[in-house]
Amino acid sequence: KGSVVALVSAALRAAGIRHATTPKPHLVSYRERVQIDGQPLAPLPFAQAVARALDAADQIEERVGPATEFEILVGAIFEALRQEKITTAIVEVGLGGRLDATHAWDGGVAVVTNVGLDHQQYLGDTIEAIAKEKGVTHITNAPMLRGRMVSVKGVPVDKVEASPEAAWALRG
């Protein structure tokens, strides 16, 4: 995922397109998790975005339960992107699938880099189940790009596509 974010960011930078990335993990500061044109968000805008995300989490906690650290961070990132008027962002998902906090972002296109037996307690315990879950990462009828996939234990590669409504998939 990180390599795809870096590659797309480099292409956007070369084209002169202002954009944000949400790389992970951070090495020194949470601010590294939201970068605009390759630079971490400044401390004050980041702190303001976190404060707004915490306020929003408090407002809905009674209905949906407490937010996780990742959900609050994603909320802060999306708020920062809104405040900075970012129209192009490369958002790296967490665990992937419909339960991932980044799924709230309507990015218009999704990239599934690979499907493996990870986050099984949330995504399923088979490659097929995980592929279907990760396939819902994107918006229906929006483009979905995917890296080279190989059949594992007889599961067809096309199981990574969420539904017949997916507009197209680029096979690498």
Where are these regions (language model features)?
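Histidine-centered active-site loop/cap adjacent to the catalytic His
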Residues: 164-171
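Short, surface-exposed amphipathic charged segments that create phosphate/polyanion-binding patches used
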Residues: 148-164
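ATP-dependent carboxylate-amine ligase catalytic core
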Residues: 14-105, 117-125, 129-131
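A conserved segment at the C-terminal end of the G1
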Residues: 3-18
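Internal gly/pro-rich beta-alpha loop/helix module
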Residues: 108-109, 122-138, 143-146, 159, ...
